[in-house]
Curated annotation (Swiss-Prot):
The keyword NADP does not apply. The lineage of its organism: Bacteria, Pseudomonadati, Pseudomonadota, Gammaproteobacteria, Enterobacterales. Pfam families: RecX_HTH1, RecX_HTH2, RecX_HTH3. Its main location: cytoplasm. This is Regulatory protein RecX. The keyword Lipid metabolism does not apply. GO terms for cellular component: cytoplasm. Modulates RecA activity through direct physical interaction. Can inhibit both RecA recombinase and coprotease activities. May have a regulatory role during the SOS response. Inhibits DNA strand exchange in vitro. Keywords: Cytoplasm, DNA damage, DNA repair, SOS response. Belongs to the RecX family.
Length: 166
């Protein structure tokens, strides 16, 4: 680290770091706080920023003010991204909880998203086990276990065979 960077005020260094972090992808406020608090890897190993709690709050407030940090946008994009990867609503809720998103914000975003979870569950099952889906009990149990692991709800999984029988 050069002398000029080490002389920069902690607020400026934190703000620069926050913008760099948020330029890569959206983060929740809690994720950003955790990453800002972590030591920076410099040429001579980890380096701490001598920042006060007020500096962290000012950086977070600045990011909110300028639209870099928005938990509702983060939640909507996260749900869309994880559902495209084949994960179900239960797993997505759990991951959002781990990222510090409130249950209310998660539920609101889940209601607003326009995703057919039953169709996604069926797509995942056919991708893994082929078309037509097996009707033998032991095979159905394997599919059910797989889909539960992926985070789909039991009612969506049961709808696969209900609709399949029609």
């Amino acid at each position: 680290m050069t002398e000029s960077t080490s002389r920069r005020p902690a607020y400026a260094r934190l703000l620069d770091r926050a913008v760099r972090i948020l330029a890569v992808r959206d983060h929740s406020e809690q994720e950003l706080r955790r990453k800002l608090a972590a030591p920076i890897m410099g040429k001579n190993g980890p380096e701490e920023i001598d920042a006060t709690a007020e500096d962290y709050e000012r950086v977070i407030a600045w990011c909110h003010e300028h639209g870099y940090l928005d938990d509702s946008r983060f939640v909507a994009r996260f749900i869309a991204s994880r559902s495209r990867k084949g994960y179900g609503p239960a797993r997505i809720r759990q991951e959002l909880n781990q990222k510090g998103i409130s249950r209310e914000a998660t539920e609101k975003a889940m209601r607003e998203c326009d995703i057919d979870w039953c169709a996604l569950a069926r797509d995942q099952a056919t991708r893994k086990y082929g078309e037509p889906l097996p009707t033998v009990f032991s095979e159905k149990v394997k599919i059910q276990r797989f889909l539960l692991y992926r985070g789909y709800l039991m009612e969506d999984i049961q709808d696969i065979w209900r609709n399949f029988a029609d």
